[in-house]
């Protein structure tokens, strides 16, 4: 049985969206057990599942504006902290939260703990591409500064995840840069390029540019945390902007525009689905001793369900244990 500790109080629509996503996951997956951490009185009205689920009550939670490290240290009974401790103590196999990203990263670093020989765990997510296959990108903001050695580790981690969780036999690894030529970039990018090119275990395809990411130029894209986070926000903003422009054009374009939208209904729905994070799952703090997964703060029940499905696959493939063995040299 795969045991998942869930912070029921994190996110914009908690606990309703969290619990409703859990209900659906428990209905579809008979091999998972969920521990809900949070205010029992607020959780119970939404909980319809009766088997393989438990509520661990706490009145304390971490708010979105709390300073991450201080919150982890001072709010020892917060729902997120208790969920992370359950993983550390072996009472759960993975932790999920839609709450404060920085606090969850701190919980991953300081409570769950790093895998031996991994210097800086990275935040990774599967982002959309036009062909629907997606690409894994890290670091998306777990670390503001990185060395070339960190980025090399991210390439290995991302490639490992793409192989074992997404089923890609030879993941193409690209280094995000300001040009595709091997001579491009600052000293960090140039040093990283040399490390990746020399690692024969990687299917390194060279530098990739931001404009090509959504065309599926690579299966794994490596970036420092500052750049990766900026690119992630740009992709999210662009996707929302495109959908907003389409909506404005349709609603303000008169009868012809509305008829055109009706004829293109299926195509527009497909586009929306491709750009929607709800089907993809959450961002994984990869490089810690158990799956620590952050779903979007504005996640609905569908996104929570997708993230639980993602965690289930990670546990099923034992990707974290395999990663630990890979880096420890066992």
Swiss-Prot record:
Please report the name of this protein according to its UniProt entry.
Answer: Phosphate acyltransferase
- Which Enzyme Commission numbers does its entry carry? 2.3.1.274
One MF term in the entry's GO annotations: phosphate:acyl-[acyl carrier protein] acyltransferase activity
Q: How does it assemble?
A: Homodimer. Probably interacts with PlsY.
User: What NCBIfam families does this protein map onto?
Assistant: plsX
- Species the sequence originates in: Streptococcus pneumoniae (strain ATCC 700669 / Spain 23F-1)
What enzyme class is recorded for this protein?
A: transferase
Swiss-Prot/TrEMBL catalytic activity:
a fatty acyl-[ACP] + phosphate = an acyl phosphate + holo-[ACP]
Gene (UniProt): plsX
Q: In which pathway does it act?
A: Lipid metabolism; phospholipid metabolism
- Function of the protein: Catalyzes the reversible formation of acyl-phosphate (acyl-PO(4)) from acyl-[acyl-carrier-protein] (acyl-ACP). This enzyme utilizes acyl-ACP as fatty acyl donor, but not acyl-CoA.
A Pfam family in this protein? FA_synthesis
* Family note: Belongs to the PlsX family.
User: Does the record's keyword annotation contain Transferase?
Assistant: yes
Q: Where in the cell is it found?
A: Cytoplasm
GO terms for biological process, alphabetical: fatty acid biosynthetic process; phospholipid biosynthetic process
Coiled coil (UniProt feature): none
- Keywords of the record: Cytoplasm, Lipid biosynthesis, Lipid metabolism, Phospholipid biosynthesis, Phospholipid metabolism, Transferase
Source organism, top-level taxon? Bacteria
Among the entry's GO cellular component annotations, what is one? cytoplasm
């Amino acid at each position: 049985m795969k045991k998942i500790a869930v912070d029921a109080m994190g996110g914009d629509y908690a606990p309703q969206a969290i619990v409703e996503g859990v209900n659906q996951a428990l209905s579809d997956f008979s091999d998972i057990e969920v521990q809900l951490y949070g205010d029992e009185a607020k959780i119970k009205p939404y909980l319809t599942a009766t088997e393989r689920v438990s509520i661990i009550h706490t009145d304390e939670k971490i708010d979105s504006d709390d300073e991450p490290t201080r919150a982890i240290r001072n709010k020892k009974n917060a729902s997120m902290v208790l969920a992370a401790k359950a993983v550390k103590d072996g009472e759960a196999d993975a932790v999920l939260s839609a709450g404060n990203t920085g606090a969850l990263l701190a919980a991953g670093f300081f409570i769950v703990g790093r895998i031996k020989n991994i210097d800086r765990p990275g935040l990774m997510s599967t982002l959309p591409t036009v062909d629907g296959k997606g690409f894994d990108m890290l670091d998306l903001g777990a670390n503001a500064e990185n060395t070339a050695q960190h980025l090399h580790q991210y390439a290995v981690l991302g490639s490992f995840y793409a192989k074992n969780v997404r089923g890609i036999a030879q993941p193409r690894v690209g280094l995000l840069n300001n040009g595709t030529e091997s001579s491009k970039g600052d000293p960090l990018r140039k040093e990283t390029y040399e490390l990746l090119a020399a690692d024969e275990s990687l299917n390194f395809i060279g530098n990739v540019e931001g404009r090509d990411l959504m065309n599926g130029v690579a299966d794994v894209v490596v970036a420092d945390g500052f750049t990766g986070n900026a690119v992630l926000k740009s992709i999210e903003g662009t996707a929302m902007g495109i959908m907003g422009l389409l909506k404005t054009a349709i609603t303000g374009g008169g009868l012809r525009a509305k008829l055109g939208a009706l004829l293109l209904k299926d195509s527009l729905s497909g586009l929306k689905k491709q750009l929607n994070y709800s089907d993809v799952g959450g961002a994984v703090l990869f490089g810690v001793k158990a799956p620590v997964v952050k779903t979007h703060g504005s996640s609905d029940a569908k996104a929570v369900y997708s993230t639980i499905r993602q965690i289930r696959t990670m546990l099923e493939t034992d990707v974290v244990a395999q990663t630990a063995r890979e880096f420890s040299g066992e």
